UniProtKB/Swiss-Prot annotation:
Pfam families in the record: ATP-synt_B (PF00430)
UniProt membrane topology term: Single-pass membrane protein
Bilayer-spanning residue ranges: 30-50
Record-linked InterPro entries: ATP_synth_B-like_membr_sf, ATP_synth_b/b'su_bac/chlpt, ATP_synthase_B_chain
Free-text function comment from the UniProt entry: F(1)F(0) ATP synthase produces ATP from ADP in the presence of a proton or sodium gradient. F-type ATPases consist of two structural domains, F(1) containing the extramembraneous catalytic core and F(0) containing the membrane proton channel, linked together by a central stalk and a peripheral stalk. During catalysis, ATP synthesis in the catalytic domain of F(1) is coupled via a rotary mechanism of the central stalk subunits to proton translocation.
GO CC term (a single one): proton-transporting ATP synthase complex
Keywords: ATP synthesis, Cell membrane, CF(0), Hydrogen ion transport, Ion transport, Membrane, Transmembrane, Transmembrane helix, Transport
Assembly with partners or alone: F-type ATPases have 2 components, F(1) - the catalytic core - and F(0) - the membrane proton channel. F(1) has five subunits: alpha(3), beta(3), gamma(1), delta(1), epsilon(1). F(0) has three main subunits: a(1), b(2) and c(10-14). The alpha and beta chains form an alternating ring which encloses part of the gamma chain. F(1) is attached to F(0) by a central stalk formed by the gamma and epsilon chains, while a peripheral stalk is formed by the delta and b chains.
Gene: atpF
Locations listed in the record: Cell membrane
MF terms in GO: proton-transporting ATP synthase activity, rotational mechanism; proton-transporting ATPase activity, rotational mechanism
Family recorded in the similarity comment: Belongs to the ATPase B chain family.
Protein name, entry field: ATP synthase subunit b
Species: Mycobacterium avium (strain 104)
Amino acid sequence: MMGDASLSVLASSQVVAEGGNNFLVPNGTFFFVLAIFLIVLAVIGTFVVPPVMKVLRERDAMVAKTAADNRKAAEQFEAAQADYEEAMTEARVQASSLRDNARAEGRKVVEDARAKAEQEVLSTLQLAARQLKRERDAVELDLRANVASMSATLASRILGVDVAPAAATTSATKTSGR
């Protein structure tokens, strides 16, 4: 065992003597790569990140504005919907009122027309009754005037004897009771 340890110490010392590439000790390439990395990081941090952050902030602001606009539009839509419903309810009430008024006016017109027609019928009936009474009175007067001569003619035909009209008038008046 001891031989193995001394062998490894010997190998290390030989490596150090040859040029010393010890992996535990950083060499110049590492520092050069580190410097390039830091320079690239600084360039990206200075020139790339701020515009990207600006675009991201603008996009966040745009999203927030869009969300606010959507909420506002939804509220306006609900308000418009409520106004529409209210207007429709009012219009339905008004239409119902107009329909009821039209029905009432229609009934009134029908009743007025019916009353006017009944009045015209009554006046026509009264006119006809007066005309019939006048005609009846005229016919009655005519018959009263001619009853004596008609009675005499009828009696002459029935009896076969010539009867005088004056006698027929007296007998007709006594018979009728007037």
